[in-house]
């Protein structure tokens, strides 16, 4: 996709397709220093145990991954990491999560950045890392309501801070939430496509 189609994409879809096993969710850690054997773990994801189903809803909203918006967000995050003096935003997120006052640590991190757009992108990335960690814990403990709230918070951050949703995604998420979904969020690269609920 990167070389042939000119789309600056990641590897989430490919990893999920090739490495996930039935009844599990794939927890993928994309830090560059990890090998393919180190960067993935299978998390038990037995929805039947809770009488739940995971729905994937295609909004039919077209999107293009080669229009530069994905690459622009990635470049903004890489520049933010450079400004913060860290190898990547995962390092910043790890520092924030270890702080005694995480809210203050996040505020100080964002205050070090030069513009509102960069602050929003970084806020999404570092809070999303913590949401993923919290989701894994909540689901492992059987706290489906907390897991659903984290799904919702993820979508809200993707809409407000990372700015990759479109009206069709937001409407589909809203409809799912109003009709009994514990949580709903967009999935994929954004700017169209599908939600999961």
Q: Where are the regions that the model predicts?
A:
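Glycine-rich, mobile lid/loop segments that gate access to catalytic sites or pores
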Residues: 1-8, 14
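C-terminal nucleotide
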Residues: 18, 22-183, 197
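Structural motif
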Residues: 193-195
């Amino acid at each position: 996709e990167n070389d042939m189609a000119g789309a600056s994409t990641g590897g989430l879809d490919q990893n999920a397709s090739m490495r996930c096993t039935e009844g599990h969710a794939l927890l993928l850690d994309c830090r560059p220093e990890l090998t393919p054997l180190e960067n993935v773990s299978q998390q038990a994801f037995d929805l039947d145990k809770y009488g739940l189903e995971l729905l994937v809803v295609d909004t039919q909203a077209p999107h293009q991954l080669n229009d530069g918006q994905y690459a622009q967000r990635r470049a903004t995050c890489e520049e933010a990491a450079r400004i913060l003096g860290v190898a990547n935003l995962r390092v910043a997120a790890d520092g924030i999560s270890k702080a005694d006052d995480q809210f203050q640590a996040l505020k100080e991190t964002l205050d070090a950045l030069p513009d509102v757009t960069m602050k929003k992108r970084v806020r999404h990335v570092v809070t999303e890392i913590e949401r993923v960690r919290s989701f894994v814990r909540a689901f492992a403990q059987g706290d489906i309501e907390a897991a659903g709230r984290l799904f919702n918070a993820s979508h809200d951050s993707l809409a407000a801070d990372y700015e990759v949703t479109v009206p069709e995604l937001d409407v589909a998420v809203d409809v799912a939430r109003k009709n009994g979904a514990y949580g709903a969020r967009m999935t994929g690269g954004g700017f169209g496509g599908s939600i999961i609920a």
